[in-house]
Amino acid sequence: RSEKYVANDDLIVHGGDVSIFSKKIHPINRLIKTAKLNPNASIILLCKKVKDTSRYGVPKISLISKELFEVDEVVEKPSKPKSSYAIMPIYFFKPEIFSYLNKIKRGKNNELQLTDAIQKTIEYGNKVLAIPMKSYDVDLDVGTPESYKHALDASYKWIH
């Protein structure tokens, strides 16, 4: 539904189940800067190194630098992850993401999965990059009741 409002503009998508705070440069600003420096990238992902990848989309990456990865493949909640990075729910997309969303089948709960559209973008030969979260970035997950309570407690500490 949002395609008609985006038209030919690039866009940032931020999932509603995680808030990210930063003591320095916010990841959204880093995504935008990375997009300006890499205008041929169709998608730029934000990734975080995690111990348990079972709740995340996971990228298979090639290191360009310690600040930038090329994404070779993405899989949602893989049984055998190809990296220890999780895709965080803040994305930079060129508007062609909509054509790839239109090429994929609906998944669980009849929803289109961004991970599937990102993989389709890669399969069609488009460049997908990722930047890592920094040590000064904090993500607060509100996807489960336990993580929601933790996020409330942590955000209260953050502002006081």
Task: Label every PLM stretch briefly.
Residues 12, 32-36, 65-142, 146-160:
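Catalytic-core segments of class I nucleotidyltransferases/pyrophosphorylases
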Residues 1-58, 63, 102-104:
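Conserved beta-loop-beta/alpha segment of the NTase-like Rossmann-fold superfamily
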